[in-house]
Amino acid sequence: MEYIFHQGDFYKEILKINNVNEDDLNIDRFFNEQYDEENILLFKEKLLSFKDKKILLVGDYDCDGICATAIIKRLLNHLDIKHSYYIPSRSDGYGLSEMIVKMAKKNNYDVIMALDNGVCANDALDLAKKLDIKVLIIDHHEYKDIPDCEAFIHPNLLKKDYQNLSAGALSYLFSAYFYDDELSLVYGGLSTLSDMVGVLNYNRYLIKRMMDILKSEDIYEINLLNDNKEIDYNSLSFNVIPKINAISRMGYNANVLVKYMLGSKEECINLLPSINKINDYRKKETEREFNIAKSLINENDDFYILISKEFKEGLCGLLANKIVSEYNKPCLVFNESDGLLKGSGRSKEDINLYEYLSNKKDIFKTFGGHNQACGLVLLKEDLNKLLEYINNEKIKTSEYKKDVIDVEIEDIDFVLYEKLLNLMPFGTDLKEPLFRINNFTYSKKIMMAYKYPKYLVNDILSAISFKSKNNKDDFSSVIGYLKKDNYHKNQLSILIEDLS
């Protein structure tokens, strides 16, 4: 759908495009709300009944899982409950497993609390019951049946305004029953941004409050990761969160991140160089593997399946995402090792990749995810079954189409950008507006880093693309997102999605 731009109607247009009402953006109602969902109260009751027990926290290795673990660890410290934590490495596999249950038993743990995992760990839950280990679960992943455990917190069991929460947000919601802790709130908001679960209702409350705290106080755990630069939504999404995720992506154990996020300033400063070094390695390796992935693509295919021993398991999701962004086709990227294919899938918004592959999940050793993203493992010998399914069962596309707002070059100024800032953060349920400039003209084209075209428009505006298909000279229309220029603070930039 196309919308004609009017400065005065801009706010209403964005809400209309996203089918969002003003109540969804109103966070005031969450400040003093007394929340009493039955399953959360049961979880509280069970946790307090284990006050004299020994608890093992089992987190996940991504930013959401790390944040959830840090939040609950702070809570257990506050409650003076004896505990420890364990973040499985990628080589261990995802989440709660029989191996972890056996380890817990060997080390005399009475209770396991699974954070950002556990909802589908049926074998591990069965073993825990046999070994008389109690299990509590805070998770937000898809499930078929409620897991067999002592207590369970999941967004699907909460009322409407609290659905679509990350594990970190759920953990903060639970911890707020006991005490008010700003650092836990910051981690709840950060996890919400990292897991792309939505930015409306309670999620918006968390993110906005997080940002207020970060701008008014020295939260050194975050500021150090952001190189002590100005904090905004982009710096969190493209600098802080990737550093947290880089540790496990590159094969290192993420337990160190919980230590960092709960450490003193001196401890964080000492750990920071290693985190930055690993993240720099992640950037270089992603670029190298992306070039390998592109060399494997047959552009005539409707669905890309890319397999290489060169792909690091932890980078498969990033590679799949970059492929989908570049080629607009669903993609599975697999690391091949010891007869196993471990990887990730991504698709654009018009395809429910998770649902499509769920129809054949019996061929996978493990499978999970969300609408446009999934993680999966299968035996190499079963690859032909997957290929046969994809060839015979064409993936369905919905009528989804990105809405655009038509603007003139003279409409783009800092007044418009300030209106965008007031609507931030954007996410899956409040999408960042795409602007289309027809009759686009520019005064000069330059190449950034020898490969990214940048078009200079006027004193305050330029347009840049990081997609190879957009390196053109002859075009009249630009579609893209409005950003502040990272290098020239008094200038704006259009991040180009498409040229025609």
Regions found by a protein language model. Give the residues of each.
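Acidic, metal-coordinating catalytic cores used for nucleic-acid/nucleotide bond scission
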Residues: 62-65, 92-93, 117-121, 487-488
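Short, surface-exposed amphipathic charged segments that create phosphate/polyanion-binding patches used
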Residues: 99-102, 167-170, 415-421
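Conserved phosphate-handling catalytic cores of large alpha/beta enzymes
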Residues: 114, 119-128, 135-197, 203-206
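Short, well-ordered strand-loop elements centered on a beta-strand within folded domains, enriched
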Residues: 151-152, 339-347, 489-499
